[in-house]
Curated annotation (Swiss-Prot):
The lineage of its organism: Eukaryota, Metazoa, Echinodermata, Eleutherozoa, Echinozoa. Residues 69-97 have a biased composition (Gly residues). This is Homeobox protein orthopedia. Involved in larval skeletal patterning. The keyword Cell wall biogenesis/degradation does not apply.
């Protein structure tokens, strides 16, 4: 019994299919590529461009008809699937209708991603949120729901706002710690209320420290120009007008409070001023001698203005100031020798005793 596939609309055959059409023999054999025979004798093509055909022993030995599986099949035949879509094959259901599957999926069924708009807070909402953030940075679910009901937002929006606010707060705190200067940690007022141990820069006195010589510096500055012009720097330091002749306390002294340190500085300043005047009075007389005798008994009470006014007066006859610096250098050298004759140790001891007495008074 000869069984053939139903006639379908003819399609253009490929080169491979044309070559296969001449390869039939008369021995009831089927020459095809990628073909499978079912139990009922029908053929299934594996590719849309393959040629499928059935053969059976014809009584006249004629070549069986060749049919190409194109866009589909009808009746009992199952043909190659879809011509252009590239999807599944066309399956016949035996009623003359074919059911096919589309190769391309439908993307319209997928739900589109919902776009969330940026939440805009009103000033009243921000004030309420900031007030609650000041209370706690980590509100629980109940507190967030309560806040959401008050401000008219959802709980998720309130939670996101607190997360962003915490991140901003942490970033600001980190930036503040990085750029904070050491001076910002000190108190605003200058002096401490009670004496406290200070740094070495306040307690140690050095020979080149000019903080204890404000009046002497002013005296040197307000000297007459003709006196400072011809006076060498080392001779000025021998007279006591420079910082090199400061009656410095040894650095090995114990640390004291800031108030005691200032008192010692004032004592040293007063003693340095008195000593400098004593040195100048040894080579002068007249107004300089009277001014020295007036200020010599007391250690305090000396002002820079009075000293500068006294020193700015014309020089006495016994200390002539001429264009040549020889006479002035000799007189200053003699004063320096007399300065060396005084006991620096005794002056230091007197300063310490005076500072101790002042400390006892203020205690």
């Amino acid at each position: 019994m000869e069984r053939t596939l139903a006639h379908v609309p003819s399609m253009e055959l490929s080169t491979e299919a044309l070559l296969v059409t001449g390869g039939l023999d008369n021995t009831n054999k089927m020459i095809t590529s990628s073909a499978v025979r079912n139990d009922d004798g029908t053929m299934i093509s594996q590719h849309s461009e393959k040629v499928s055909y059935g053969t059976s022993g014809a009584p006249d030995g004629s070549t069986p008809p060749v049919t190409a599986a194109g866009g589909g099949s009808e009746g009992n035949g199952i043909g190659g699937g879809g011509g252009g879509g590239g999807g599944g094959g066309m399956v016949g259901d035996g009623t003359g209708h074919s059911v096919g599957s589309s190769g391309s999926g439908n993307d319209d069924d997928k739900p589109a991603k919902q776009k969330r708009h940026r939440t805009r807070f009103t000033p009243a909402q921000l004030n309420e949120l900031e007030r609650n953030f000041a209370k706690t940075h980590y509100p629980d679910i109940f507190m967030r729901e309560e806040i959401a009901m008050r401000v008219g937002l959802t709980e998720s929006r309130v939670q996101v706002w607190f997360q962003n606010r915490r991140a901003k707060w942490k970033k600001r705190k980190k930036t503040t710690n990085v750029f904070r200067t050491p001076g910002a940690l000190l108190p605003s007022h200058g002096l401490a209320q009670f004496p406290s141990p200070m740094n070495d820069s306040f307690c140690n006195f050095h020979g080149q420290d000019t903080r204890g010589w404000p009046a002497m510096s002013g005296m040197t500055t307000h000297m007459a120009p003709h006196m400072t012009t011809h006076m060498p720097s080392h001779q000025m330091s021998q007279m006591g007008g420079g910082p090199g002749s400061a009656l410095a306390l040894p650095p090995s002294l114990p640390r004291q409070g800031l108030g005691q340190t200032m008192q010692q500085q004032s004592v040293n300043c007063s003693m340095g001023q008195t000593t400098g005047l004593n040195t100048l009075s040894m080579g002068t007389n007249g107004s300089m001698g009277s001014m020295t005798s007036m200020y010599q008994p007391s250690l305090g009470g000396m002002t820079t203005g009075s000293m500068s006014s006294g020193l700015s007066s014309p020089s006495p006859p016994n200390l002539p100031v001429t264009d040549s610096s020889t006479d002035l250098s000799c007189s200053v050298s003699d004063a320096g020798d007399m300065w060396r004759g005084t006991s620096i140790a005794s002056l230091r001891r007197k300063a310490l005793e005076h500072a101790a007495s002042l400390n006892g008074i203020f205690r």
